[in-house]
């Protein structure tokens, strides 16, 4: 059987680099093969490539730490920009644009790729910024606006609840239907005025909500009307009453 040309010529193929090397092994007086200068050089090349690989591809824990630091930095920039805007009530168009740009940077490093399959979504979240005029009610006198708004989502029971605090303590509960691993269709069912007077929601009380970022501390969502919602975790143990 004919030998491959590389064996006929004494050429060796490096599996790591794909380059051909020519050379042979010399035998010592003891009968054991000893490496030639070329073989020693090849060993040095392999060591150099190994060192390069270590620095070109850092260990996984370094990459994870880098991502975590980036997320922390972007979140902090967003929260600092939101802080003086009274949940968005005093935000100018330029403020809204800047917040949206910062929010998109945070969304780009979302650590939870399928939020609706994660327990991180569950619990009571406090609204800290929104562009929704119906929630902010900025045209009303300040004493008639809700001081704090909460939203709860239970992915296990497919329920949603929005709550206001002082002065009216209004709330609304509804059902959610997953459209994919990030987005839900929302159908509101019952309003409670002053916290205890139930009113059935109209059939038109529908919408969609996409969770664009979530971790243990922060959640960003976008509605089907283009509104941005930014919430911080208030109580991870809270569950919507059935």
Curated annotation (Swiss-Prot):
Keywords recorded for this protein, A-Z: Chloroplast, Coiled coil, Plastid, Thylakoid, Transit peptide
Subcellular location: Plastid, Chloroplast thylakoid
Keyword check for Plastid: yes
Gene Ontology, cellular component aspect: chloroplast; chloroplast thylakoid; chloroplast thylakoid membrane; cytosol; plastoglobule
UniProt KW Heme keyword: no
Superkingdom per UniProt: Eukaryota
Residue range of the transit peptide in the UniProt record, numbered on this chain: 1-50
Coiled-coil zones: 63-87
Positions of disulphide bridges: none
Protein family according to the UniProt entry: Belongs to the PAP/fibrillin family.
PANTHER family on file: PLASTID-LIPID-ASSOCIATED PROTEIN 4, CHLOROPLASTIC-RELATED
Record protein name field: Probable plastid-lipid-associated protein 4, chloroplastic
Organism field: Arabidopsis thaliana (Mouse-ear cress)
Gene name as annotated: PAP4
